[in-house]
Amino acid sequence: MNFFMDIRDKVFAATGKVKADTIFFGGLLINVNTKEMLYRDIAVKEGYIVGIGDVSSLKGDETEMIDVTGKHLCPGLMDGHVHFESSMVTLSQFAVPALAHGTTSVVIDPHEIANVLGRGGIELVLDEAATLPLNAFVAVSSCVPATSFETAGASIDVDDIVSLIANENVVGLGEMMDYPGVVFCDETKLSMIRTALKERLVVDGHCPALSREQLFGYMCAGISTDHESIEYEEALEKLRLGMKLMIREGSAAKALDKFLPRLIGDGVSLENVFFVTDDKHPSDLLKGYMDVIVRRAIELGLSPLDAISMCTINAAKHYRVDHIVGSLSMGRKADIIVLEDLEKFIIDSVYASGRPVESFVPSYEYPDTVFNTVKFDAVTATDLQIMSDADKDHRVRVIKVVPDLIVTENETFVLHSDRHGILMPDVENDVLSVAVIERHGKNGNIGTGFIKGMGLRNGAIGQSIGHDSHNVVVTGVDHSDMALCANTIRSMNGGICVVSNGKVVEQLELPFAGLLSTLPAEEVEKKLTDLHKAVKEIGCALPAPFITHSFIALPVIPSLRLTDMGLFDVDKFSLVSPIDEVME
C-alpha cells in the first residue's frame, strides 16, 4: 500500500511524457465530487489516476486497454470504522473478501490486538498494512484498556500515541470510549486528545446516551464522530451540534434501517454522515461488505449517487485522506469498481491501484510471539460458581442481552441456592451462569455473574474474544461444562468452543493473540457455521451469538457488564455485587 507516488512522476504521466500503464475506456464515471455521471476514460500510472476524459495522448504501445463500455465506474468503497479482528482472520486474509466486494479502503482501530499485544501489536498491524493492496488507514487505539475495571494484556499511554501517530498510515485517534474520563477531565485522556489534534488528526468518539451537558463537554474536547447512538433523536442531535454521524451496520449492531429513512424523510443533509461496520463476522464478510450497505441504502430510498458518496468521499473527507482515496479524481489512487448495474449495485470487477484484486495472495509472515497469549491456570467448576447462604432465595443482578444491539439491560431475578450455598442457573427462565477469566497471565482473576437472553438449554459456550481486554468469556447451564469449555480454549491457545452434556462438540482455534486465525476467511466461516449449528442445537437463537457474547465484558457500553474483576454497573461506573439481596 503506497500512498504516495512521486510528484514528478505523476506530472510526467499526466502530461504524456511517460505513457499510462492502463486505460479504462467507454465507461460512465460516477463523480462524487459533483454528483454527476459522465462518460469518461481513465488513465492510470503506477496505481494513480493521471488522466480523465480524452486520454488518447497518454496511450502508449504497451498501455493495457480495458473495455468497460456500458458499465459504471465507481470509486472503491470505504469503511470508516472497523475493528477488523471481529472477522477472526488476519488483516491480510480480511483484505481478500473486502477487496472482492469493492471495499478498497478501511479505517481500522486495532484495539483488540492492542489490548493483547500493546504498542507492538499496532506496529505489527501498520507493518502488515503497508504490504497490502487494501488501503488500511489506522486510528490509534485510545482506550487500552477501556477502563481500569478489567485486566488487559497491555496498555497504550501517551508516549505510545506520540510514537505511533508518526506513521504516515495513521489518520486519527481511535474511538474515545472512556467518556467519563473526558468529561471529568482525566489528564491522560486529555493529553492523548491534545497530541492527536496538535498533529491535525481527527479524534473519533464513542458516546451513547450521554446527558446534554456531558455531550457538550465531550464534543468540546475535540471529538468529532460517534457510531453508538441508540435512538434516532440522539443521532440527529449530535449531527445538529456538529458531530459527524457514523451509521453502523455491522454483524451485531445495526442502525441503517432505523436511522437512514428518518434522515431522508426529515430532509437532513447527509454530507456529514457516512457508513461503517464497526464489527464484521466472517460469514457476513464473505456475503458482502460495504457493497451490502450501499445496496440496502438504495433500497431504503437513497439515490445511488448519495449512497455511494456516503461510502466513499464522506469518510475520506472526514479522515483528511480525500487527496488519496474517496473519488475517481486526478492524482487519486485508481481504486475502481466496475458496476454491471448501478441501481442494484451489482459488481462486475474491482481494481485496487489499477490492478485486478483477484491477483492478491496473502503472504505476510508473523512473529512467534503472537501465538502465545493465553496464559491462565486450568479452572474447575468450583472456580466459576457464586456461593452464598445455603437453601435461600437471592435477588441477583442479571445481564440481559438485547438481540441486534450490543447494549445490555440491568435486571434482577430471584435464584435459589442449593444446600451447599451454590447459586444455580434457572434454565427455564433463561438465567444462566457467566464467567470472565483473566487470560493474560497477570493475576488469575475470575469474575462471575448471571446472564439472560443467551437461551442455552444445556452445556456451555466460551471464547477468548471478549471486548475489549479479551479475557475468556464463558456462559453455561452447568459449571462443569463451563470449566471444560474454558480449559479447551486454554489448550487451543485461544478460540471458540461449544460444549454439550460434558463433551466438546465444536471448536475453532484462534491462535493469533487468541483472536484470529491465519487461515482464509472461507475456512474460518465453515468452522463458524458448524459452531453456529452447535450453539443453536443447545438452545441459542441469537442471530450473531458469538459477537453478542463477546461484548458481555465491555464496561463502557450500558448497562450491566462482567469483567474479570466482577460485575460492573456502567451507569454507576462502579463494580457491584452479583447478589442484590439475600431474601428471608
UniProtKB/Swiss-Prot annotation:
GO biological process: adenine catabolic process
UniProt source species: Methanococcoides burtonii (strain DSM 6242 / NBRC 107633 / OCM 468 / ACE-M)
EC number(s) per entry: 3.5.4.2
Protein name per UniProt: Adenine deaminase
InterPro entries registered for this protein in UniProt: Adenine_deam, Adenine_deam_C, Amidohydro-rel, Metal-dep_hydrolase_composite, Metal_Hydrolase
Membrane-crossing segments per the record: none
Keywords for the protein's UniProt record, in alphabetical order: Hydrolase, Manganese
Primary enzyme class: hydrolase
